Each structure stands twice: as C-alpha cells, then as structure tokens.
C-alpha cells in the first residue's frame, strides 16, 4: 500500500483543474494510496471524461480494496482494447448520442446510386473460369471467421460453429469451414510447378462467451485436420455500457465495482487483426487476400472460388459478396453513396434506411424492383474479400477503428432517458466507410440458392415469417444445402428428382434428396462435372453421402440411402441400381425436450431404416 505522502502526490498528479483537491470525487481521493501509478492515470482519465459517479459509493481504504483494484484492472482492459483508448470511446459516444437525440440522419447530404459489380450465373463459362482463377489465388489468401456469438437466438445453448451444418453426416459448421479451406489449399498447391508447402492461415475471432468452447471444439477434434499452427484465435473484448446521453458509464447492476459491458460487434475484427501483427506476417509470406465470413452460412464456400476470381481479375480492393435482393427485403443493400461535397463510398445500407433514403433523393418509388424482378441494390451477405496491401495501408491510418453507431431505447419521446443501458456498436462490413474515393470497391452477386442459407432464427420466430420470405432457421439452412447440392448435380447432368413440400416447426420447405459431399470431392463446378455422368439418377426419398475425393458416379440409379467412403487417393466408380428402405424423415416438435437441441430446432430427424455403405 502507498503512504499518505504518496497519496498526496497522486492527488497532485491527477492535475484536474477547476474543482481539484478535496472537491472532486472525495471517495476516490481517500483511496488513492491504494493505487499504482498507472491506475492513477486511469483515474485521471475517467474524471476528465465526467465519470466521477463511478467512485461515489467507494468506502474508506481497508474495505473492498481487492474489488477496487479489480475495478482498475477492468478499466485497463477497456482502455487498451479500444482504438484510441477509453477517452476516445466516451467522446465518440457523446457525439453519437447527441446525434441520436437530435434525430440526425447519418446519410444526410448523400445520394444513392447503383455501384458497379459482377453478376455471375452458376455453371456458365465465365463462372467456371472465375472459379479456376479463384482456386489459383487461394494459396495467397487468409481466412477470417467472426464467431463471437452463442446460439441462444436459435434455441441452442452451445457455440454456433459447433452446430451441425446438416444432420445427414452431423458435421458441424467449423468442420465444414476447415475442410473447405484445406480443400482450397490442396487444389491451389496442385497448380504450382514444383513443391508447394503453402498453409492457408485461418483466424477465428471469439468472445468471452465463445473462446473456451471454440478452443475445446478444435482441440478435441484435432483441429479437423488442419495444422494447429495454421489457426489463430483472436478474442474480442466487450465495451463499456452507457447510462445516459452524457455518456456516463453504467455500473453493473450486480457489482458496484464493475462497469457493465456488452459486445461491440463484429467490426472489432479489423482492430484485432491490426494489433495482432498477423497482417504483416501474411504479407511477408506472399498473402494477397483476406477473406472474412460469418459463423452459420452453410453454403458460403460455394461462393468463395468464383468471388476470389473476381477480386483477382477485376483488381478489387474490396469485394462484397451479395445475392439478388427483392425490393424492401429485410437484408441490407450494397449502395454507392455520393455526398454533396464530392465524397463517395460503396457500403451496405440497411434495408430500413435504403427505402427512405431513395425516396428523399428523387426516387419516388423508393426501393423498387427493376426489370430483372429484383432491386438494383444487391443484398449484402457479410462476406468480404479485401486486398491485403490497401487494407494494411488503411489500418495504419485508422488502427482498425470502424465507423460506429448507437441504438438507445428511450423511455419516451423527449429522448432524455434510456430504458436500459446502451453501448456503441460496429459492423465488419462498414470497413469501406473510411476509404478514399480512389479505392476500388465492388461486389459479386450469385444466386441465393447457391451461396446463402444463414442459420440465425429460432423455430418460434421462423414460424411467424410471412410465406415466401426466407426463414433463415436451422430447418431452412439444412434443406438449402440439399437443394443446392441437388441443383449442382442436375447442372452437371444427373437426373435428380423434384422436391416435395413439407412443414417442420411451422415452416414450409422444399425437401430435396439428401445429397452431401466432402469439399475435396466437389470444390468447384468443374470438379463435380468431371465426376458425375448424365446417365445417373437419384430419387426424392434418397440420401447420397460422398466421402472421398476420387469417387465418380456413372450409371447410378439410387432409390434409398448410399454412403460411399474412399480413403485418401483411392479411386472408385459408383454404378448400378441401388435400392433399399433408406432413411425416413421423422417430424420432431421443437418443444420436445426428449430430443437434443440441435434436432429440436430443425423439426426433423432421420430414422435410419436401411442403407448401403461402401468402403474403399
């Protein structure tokens, strides 16, 4: 403990003018002898930013001293994890809260227009050549998964990446992502003359909620075949909550020595990458691209090769992956914004802001479908491809700070008080907001059936979705995988039966044959086309599982369930008529607690009556 003399020196060191000495935060002043010099500096920072209320309840020295020190440990973490420190956070909050109270529109002065980008058609010559270009570039890429969320919104208590992507094989999202990256790594290396030892880096951004469970999932599954040195875990910290319009920090209702915190959003990934030193390491080893993606879109790797091919051939510094979007659909639209002062940016504009923005800037119909039947503003699916050189240059200026927003819930129309504390938030896809007009920012559009099936809504909420709108549930997410794989095989020439319509957990969906394959088998369409011949057919009630890189399908007539396993480079041709009782689909009520959560949230399970399993 410091002496009284040290305490007096500490008081003097605070140097707060205008009400210094005994007049400011007396409870803190009495406790200054407890504090180390760096904690005194943090105290000064808090007082300078109008946060003396944090100390009003502090008792005399000797009472709760450890809790007081823990308080400053937390303040130190909050200060070090935010670009510019806690003072910047409070100042930014004050400005954004004032703008919110005044009803200021962040898009004032901006006019929207349709940005330039690429619209791809699955399976045509252009698509195939872009996929091949993307595979060639993959060895120069690094992948970043933002996975800070639990599955509570889904009705699942675990981490979202541990959720089965589909239940035919039971493989979780994280396994599929890693196997897809490894397949890209292998295919890309094969295009290099001579030896290629490239290991594609994979970063996972976690949070306090998901970190330990993510590490456990990786370690208990031997990293799903990836070398542990390829995987980097970056944990994001939460940010301080704000109690009022003056940006006074909120204390935890259950602990008066702790500042209440909440997640800052997945925009933190940029600051974490900047501070980690990984970008410099990657650039020095020849990386050109950083690919960002979110945690539960089971189709996203269908889009990666061709989109990476677009980035490489078009020279995009930023490439946002997108899907065709119906006007007013509840998904953000990628939009070019031009300010009256000449500034331009290409960013995601949320759907509830896009329509009024268009109406206010000379588009009387607002967000309307064009002759294609879709809005000209494509739907953002939160997958970004950034060119590493310009990305690093931008982060040198911003240190990874991303344009923030605040969304307080006010008690009434005066906007003077909050119903509960709020905080600043930021989104990964808002990175382009700070880019200069010279930046080459574009997008790549692909059909949603091929690339977009997020799993984010629970059964109750999904059942309320109007008919015809996407459910974005575990039910629709799994069925979308079977639909995509069936349509890919159809395009390759196989005869795949039409789906039937069924309802699970109140959601009406198409049920296609349950077809799955490992990424090494069908990484790009050219691979699939080379392995599937037109004289093969699969009935609607069938399930086909392909576990092997060099399995070909020729003259197969499947009516039932077939699982084909081939080790490593073993080659095998699947042929002939195969019929068995197969796997039937059994309805499951989402309230049936006798079933596992991951089954209940889907509303179905497979009754494995009969199957043929071939091993080579």
UniProtKB/Swiss-Prot annotation:
InterPro entries per UniProt: Nucleotide-diphossugar_trans (IPR029044), UDP-sugar_pyrophosphorylase (IPR039741), UDPGP_fam (IPR002618)
An example molecular function term from Gene Ontology annotations: UTP:arabinose-1-phosphate uridylyltransferase activity
Organism classification: Eukaryota, Viridiplantae, Streptophyta, Embryophyta, Tracheophyta
Alphabetized CDD domains for the sequence: UGGPase (cd06424)
Gene Ontology CC entries for this record: cytosol; pollen tube
Source organism per UniProt: Oryza sativa subsp. japonica (Rice)
UniProt keyword list: Nucleotidyltransferase, Transferase
Catalytic activity: a monosaccharide 1-phosphate + UTP + H(+) = a UDP-monosaccharide + diphosphate
Keyword flag Repressor: no
GO BP terms in the entry: pollen development; UDP-alpha-D-glucose metabolic process; UDP-D-galactose metabolic process; UDP-glucuronate metabolic process; UDP-L-arabinose metabolic process; UDP-N-acetylglucosamine biosynthetic process
Name by which UniProt lists this protein: UDP-sugar pyrophosphorylase
Enzyme class: transferase
Cofactors demanded by this protein: Mg(2+); Mn(2+)
Similarity comment: family membership: Belongs to the USP family.
Function: May function as the terminal enzyme of the myo-inositol oxidation (MIO) pathway. May also play a role in the salvage pathway for synthesis of nucleotide sugars.
The gene coding this protein: USP
Domain of life, source organism: Eukaryota
EC number: 2.7.7.64
């Amino acid at each position: 403990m410091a002496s009284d003399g040290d305490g007096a020196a500490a008081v003097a060191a605070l140097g707060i003018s205008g009400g210094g000495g005994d007049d400011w935060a007396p409870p803190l002043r009495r406790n200054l002898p407890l504090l180390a010099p760096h904690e005194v500096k943090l105290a000064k920072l808090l007082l300078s930013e109008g946060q003396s209320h944090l100390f009003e309840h502090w008792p005399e020295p000797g009472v709760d001293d450890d809790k007081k020190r823990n308080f400053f440990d937390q303040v130190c973490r909050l200060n070090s994890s935010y670009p510019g420190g806690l003072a910047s956070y409070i100042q930014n909050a004050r400005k954004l809260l004032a703008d919110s109270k005044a009803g200021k529109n962040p898009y004032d002065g901006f006019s929207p227009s349709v940005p330039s980008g690429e619209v791809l058609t699955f399976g045509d010559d252009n698509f195939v050549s872009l996929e091949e270009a993307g595979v060639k570039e993959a060895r120069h890429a690094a992948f970043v998964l933002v996975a800070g969320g639990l599955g509570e919104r889904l009705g699942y208590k675990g981490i979202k990446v541990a959720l089965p992507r589909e239940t035919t094989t039971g493989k979780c999202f994280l396994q599929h992502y890693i196997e897809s990256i490894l397949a890209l790594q292998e295919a890309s290396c094969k295009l290099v003359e001579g030896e290629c030892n490239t290991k594609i880096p994979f970063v996972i951004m976690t949070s306090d909620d998901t970190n330990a469970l993510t590490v456990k999932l990786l370690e208990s599954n031997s990293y799903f075949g990836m070398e542990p040195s390829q995987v980097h875990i970056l944990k994001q910290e939460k940010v301080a909550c704000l109690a009022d319009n003056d940006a006074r920090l909120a204390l935890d209702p259950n602990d008066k020595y702790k500042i209440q915190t909440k997640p800052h959003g997945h925009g933190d990934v940029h600051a974490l990458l900047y501070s980690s030193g990984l970008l410099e390491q990657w650039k020095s080893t020849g990386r050109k691209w950083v690919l960002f993606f979110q945690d539960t879109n089971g189709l996203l790797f269908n889009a990666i090769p061709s989109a990476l091919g677009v980035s490489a051939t078009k020279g995009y510094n930023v490439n946002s992956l997108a899907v065709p979007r119906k006007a007013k659909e509840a998904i953000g639209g990628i939009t070019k914004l031009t300010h009256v002062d000449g500034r331009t940016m290409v960013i995601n504009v949320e759907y509830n802001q896009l329509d009024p923005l268009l109406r206010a800037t000379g588009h009387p119909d607002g967000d309307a479908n064009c002759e294609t039947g879709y809005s000209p503003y494509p739907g953002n699916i939160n997958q970004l491809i950034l060119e590493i050189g310009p990305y690093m240059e931008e982060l040198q200026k911003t240190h990874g700070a991303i344009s923030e927003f605040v969304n307080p819930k006010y008690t009434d129309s005066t906007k003077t008080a909050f119903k509960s504390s709020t905080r600043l938030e930021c989104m990964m896809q808002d990175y382009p907001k700070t880019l200069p007009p010279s930046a080459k920012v574009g997008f790549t559009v692909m059909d949603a059936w091929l690339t977009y099936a997020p799993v984010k809504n629970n059964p109750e909420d999904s059942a309320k979705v109007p008919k015809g709108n996407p459910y974005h549930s575990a039910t629709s997410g799994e069925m979308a995988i079977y639909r995509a794989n069936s349509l890919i095989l159809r395009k390759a020439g196989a005869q795949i039966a039409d789906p039937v319509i069924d309802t699970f957990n109140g959601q009406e969906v198409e049920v296609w044959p349950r077809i799955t394959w490992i990424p090494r088998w069908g990484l790009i369409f050219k691979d699939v086309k080379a392995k599937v011949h037109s004289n093969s057919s699969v009935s609607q009630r069938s399930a086909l599982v392909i576990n092997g890189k060099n399995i070909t399908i020729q003259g197969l007539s499947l009516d039932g369930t077939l699982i084909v396993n081939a080790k490593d480079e073993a080659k095998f041709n699947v042929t002939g008529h195969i019929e068995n009782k197969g796997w039937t689909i059994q309805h499951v009520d989402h309230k049936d607690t006798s079933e596992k959560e991951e089954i209940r949230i889907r509303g179905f399970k497979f009754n494995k009556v009969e199957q043929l399993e071939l091993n080579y």
